[in-house]
Design a protein with these regions (language model features):
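A contiguous, low-structure linker/loop signature
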Residues: 1-28, 40-42
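Metal-dependent catalytic neighborhoods of phosphoester/phosphodiester hydrolases
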Residues: 183-186, 219-224
Length: 240
């Protein structure tokens, strides 16, 4: 048990008889979506569960065992010189940031609740911009508790601008639905309509895209926001 604890960042990743099967299937969904884009699809979505963005290379945490978005980005790198991971889960993706913090081939940008009094607490601050070769390839835009639709959407637009400025050739969207005001873990005040608008905004980005599902803990909210996001995203991607 002590050895297992060395590779666990918190108490949120219990391991049972079926854990590995679920974790592996979730990661393989991300692999399949990324392979579809590598082979020529303009977009693909991985309905991952459990989520992944709190998982480090060698550590589970925050309900996450394998980092699905990072795995997808690795697959995309077989075709694209630089990939951007853009994360709008209400929690900062500390695992994703750590994996790519010293690298310039994957840009990571995150919009999330200010971590000063919110999980993951020790990462997600605006002054974390990357290190060494990865300097300026990490962007954190923390939002104060109670933040609503307009600042949330504006911050996502800033992520997109930064990813394009970094010359990303493909995008992984870490799509967390838990910023919704009805989510039991949310401290933000984001509405269902904001996710609809986000779908349109991300759909306008002229890059091959993999959507990887992250968090979301209100089934009622997910039933509203995920279809709205995906529908608007796909509508924008249709040839005019």
């Amino acid at each position: 048990i002590a050895h297992a604890g060395w590779y666990a960042g918190d108490m949120a990743c219990a391991i049972g008889a079926g854990t590995w099967d679920g974790v592996y299937a979730s990661a393989q969904a991300a692999v399949a979506a990324a392979k579809a884009v590598v082979e020529g699809a303009e977009e693909a979505m991985a309905l991952c569960r459990p989520p992944g963005h709190h998982a480090y290379q060698d550590r589970s945490s925050g309900f996450c065992f394998l980092n699905n978005a990072a795995i997808a980005a690795g697959v995309l790198r077989s075709r694209f010189k630089r990939v951007a991971i853009l994360d709008f889960d209400t929690h900062h993706g500390d695992g994703t940031q750590a994996i790519f913090y010293r690298r310039s081939d994957v840009f990571y940008g995150s919009v999330h609740t200010d971590p000063r009094n919110y999980y993951p607490y020790y990462a997600g601050y605006a002054d974390e911009t990357g290190f060494g070769e990865g300097d300026k390839f990490n962007l954190n835009l923390p939002l104060a508790p109670g933040t609503g639709d307009e600042p949330f959407i504006d911050a996502n637009q800033k992520l997109i601008v930064a990813a394009l400025a970094a010359e990303a050739e493909a995008i992984v969207i870490s799509a967390g639905w838990d910023a919704h005001f009805d989510d039991p873990l949310s401290k933000l005040a984001v509405t269902s309509d904001a996710y609809r608008r986000l779908g349109r905004i991300y759909g306008e980005v002229p890059l091959p895209t993999v959507i990887v599902q992250e968090g979301g803990y209100s089934l009622a909210a997910i039933e509203e926001v995920a279809p709205r996001f995906v529908s608007e995203f796909l509508d924008e991607r249709q040839p005019s």
